[in-house]
Amino acid sequence: MNRGALIKLVESRYVRTDLPEFRPGDTVRVSYKVKEGNRTRIQDFEGIVIRIRRNGFNTTFTVRKVSYGVGVERIFPLHSPLIQKIDIVQRGRARRAKLYFIRNLSDREIRRKLRADRKRIDQDRAAERAAKEEAQKAQEPKASQE
């Protein structure tokens, strides 16, 4: 077994598959574990994904938000065990893979550039509806057996 295959084998044990797919332009809420002193709490960071750097297990994504008039960017490792969950607040339609240009835009201009992606939003809603119906069907036989 060569070195690259061994590294992939070890990394595959730690790859997270429970996180949703998202793209640059999407607005996400990342729940991240933060350790302060001797206690741990979960901190939410909500903003626009401006970059995804895909590098296997070392994949990172950058989220940007404006807080009290100051732009804040945070880089998260995608497969980090400190990420509790990622919620997709809104799907955005971006025409570029790296959205560095939004650093120089106002909120209004950003909204104009990153329109909501209705097609992907509708697909997400349909998938959620199907999952709910599937769960209801799974519950019905249990009720009839009792």
Swiss-Prot record:
What the entry lists under Pfam families is as follows: Ribosomal_L19 (PF01245)
A cellular component term, taken from the record's GO annotations: cytosolic large ribosomal subunit
What biological-process terms (Gene Ontology) are attached?
A: translation
Identify the PROSITE patterns for this entry. RIBOSOMAL_L19
| InterPro entries membership | Ribosomal_bL19 (IPR001857), Ribosomal_bL19_CS (IPR018257), Ribosomal_bL19_sf (IPR038657), Translation_prot_SH3-like_sf (IPR008991)
Superkingdom of the source? Answer: Bacteria
Any idea what job this protein has?
Contacts the 16S rRNA of the 30S subunit (part of bridge B6), connecting the 2 subunits.
Q: Which family does it belong to?
A: Belongs to the bacterial ribosomal protein bL19 family.
Q: Subunit structure, briefly?
A: Part of the 50S risobomal subunit. Contacts protein L14. Forms a bridge to the 30S subunit in the 70S ribosome, contacting the 16S rRNA.
According to UniProt, the name of this protein is Large ribosomal subunit protein bL19
Q: What is the lineage of its organism?
A: Bacteria, Thermotogati, Deinococcota, Deinococci, Thermales
